[in-house]
């Protein structure tokens, strides 16, 4: 796909569970090549939103579109990266990366070529025959990233992918993820509880409101890359987002 032409859009999307309003009238757009982070207090609907976009659930009302086409279910145009890795323990690193390609019916030689490309991209070529229980948490998450990219999705959906990692590994994985994003030119929609992570990664930060189950604020992050967490402007933006989240928590 031409990286200058794609977009992903939510139009007035709502989700209700047995009378409980999880989301109410959510609208926003992710543009081609854009890195968007979603933040907000617990219970504001971040994970529900991601499940709707992934096609794992259907909205009660509203429309989700990819390049103008309505999303009605899961599809290979959306790649998922999970916090809990979700790797098959009986498959090698290569086998996990090739799983989606097998479902597509690609020949073994084609699968191997694609897997090798993404093994190299995430720096795991020497571990291609290893099993998940032989890998560190950061390495497992790299496998998850490679598996998502191997299917060549238009957008990557990431649900707290680094939340289970220690602080040092998490920072390292953020750097790695940015490098991969720059290389692949994918749209990224990244859910996180960490405001610091959102400010470090995102072109745009979407703050969800637990009060209204909607988007409270969309903040454009124009801090130059590479970003310095100790920089005054970085700290200022982080504090601005934290202040709004604290207001949401206080309301609840």
Regions found by a protein language model. Name each.
Residues 39-41:
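The feature captures the beta-strand-to-loop junction immediately N-terminal to the Walker
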Residues 54:
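Helix-to-loop junction immediately C-terminal to a conserved catalytic motif
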Residues 82, 94-102, 112, 116, ...:
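Short helical segment in ABC ATPase nucleotide-binding domains corresponding to the A-loop/adjacent helical element
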Residues 102, 109-127, 179:
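Conserved ABC ATPase "signature" region
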